[in-house]
């Protein structure tokens, strides 16, 4: 059934589907003509990326500049990218005017928000469309642990939050958070620290600074980050809602006392393993919360976003 859907999608976007299907037999390039009249020399993976973006591509201009280099533009945006990222940029351009300031740095703007950041930030914005951060934050204080480049804080602000309290340990990310808070006049406290079981510092190893940088990252490079104990962060925040996306550091919430967890009424927590998921669910249920929603991450079976709401009048 899946194969039939792939064949059908291929036939509906290309004028020479037999040639397209022949690409699956090897790593060759062929000239593929799309239904909108545009022709590109593509491998099968390249065709698949363009095929999956075709509804948008049929309304914009896509020019092939090299073997795997494309210029994507419409009336308000202009981007040079590889085929693999065409679906991402196509989706982002539906919602924002996008200007590419360098190979991996972008300026986004629509009638509600303005942001600057990396390709990884665009991926995070795309993921927000799944509804993973959906909540009633109108007039509320939101604690944002794992602020990355400020895109999640901007999301909550756009949804009506009155203040953001942001924790992010990576200096490069903190700089972008500050820029994005200023661009949008967001009322925010920004803390250049991560969270853990106790105050201190920790060495993080990595190869690339990206959203996946965390306590269990591996690589040849290293940075030292500041850690603040999670109990103090929760207790001092005065927040109504807390969002955690901190690459396995969310596990420290298991060791926070129930009465401290209850100081915040709603939690959105991205978990990064089946083991952490189980421990977090057990902890929050025992602390007087109900699991209100869970969104699974596509292609990452052990990753999901859990939303917990405090049960009124519950006593631990």
Where are these regions (language model features)?
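Phosphate/nucleotide-binding beta-alpha loop and adjacent structural elements of enzyme active sites
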Residues: 1-316
């Amino acid at each position: 059934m899946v194969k039939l859907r792939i064949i059908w999608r291929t036939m509906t976007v290309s004028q020479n589907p037999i040639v397209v299907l022949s690409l699956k037999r090897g790593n060759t390039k062929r000239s593929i003509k799309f239904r909108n009249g545009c022709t590109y020399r593509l491998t099968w993976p390249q065709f698949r990326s363009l095929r999956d973006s075709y509804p948008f591509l049929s309304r914009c201009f896509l020019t092939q500049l090299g073997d795997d280099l494309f210029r994507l533009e419409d009336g308000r945006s202009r981007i040079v990218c590889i085929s693999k990222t065409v679906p991402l940029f196509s989706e982002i351009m539906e919602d924002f005017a996008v200007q590419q300031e360098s190979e991996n740095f972008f300026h986004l703007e629509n009638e509600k928000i303005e942001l600057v950041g990396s390709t990884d930030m665009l991926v995070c914005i795309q993921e927000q469309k799944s509804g993973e951060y959906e909540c009633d934050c109108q007039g509320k204080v939101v604690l944002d642990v794992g602020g990355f480049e400020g895109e999640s804080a901007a999301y909550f602000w756009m949804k009506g939050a009155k203040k953001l309290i942001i924790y992010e340990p990576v200096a490069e990310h903190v700089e972008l958070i500050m820029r994005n808070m200023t661009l949008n006049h967001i009322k925010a406290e920004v803390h250049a620290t991560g969270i853990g079981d106790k105050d201190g510092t920790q060495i993080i190893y990595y190869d690339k600074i990206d959203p996946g940088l965390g306590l269990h990252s591996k690589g040849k490079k290293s940075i030292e980050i500041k850690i603040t104990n999670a109990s103090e962060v929760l207790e001092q925040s005065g927040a109504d809602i807390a969002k955690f996306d901190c690459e396995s550091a969310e596990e420290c919430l298991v060791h926070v006392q129930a009465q401290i967890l209850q100081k915040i009424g709603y939690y959105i927590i991205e978990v990064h393993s089946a083991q952490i998921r189980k421990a977090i669910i057990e902890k929050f249920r025992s602390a007087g919360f109900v699991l209100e929603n869970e969104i699974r991450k596509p292609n990452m079976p052990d990753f999901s976003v859990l939303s917990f709401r405090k049960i009124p009048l519950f006593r631990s």
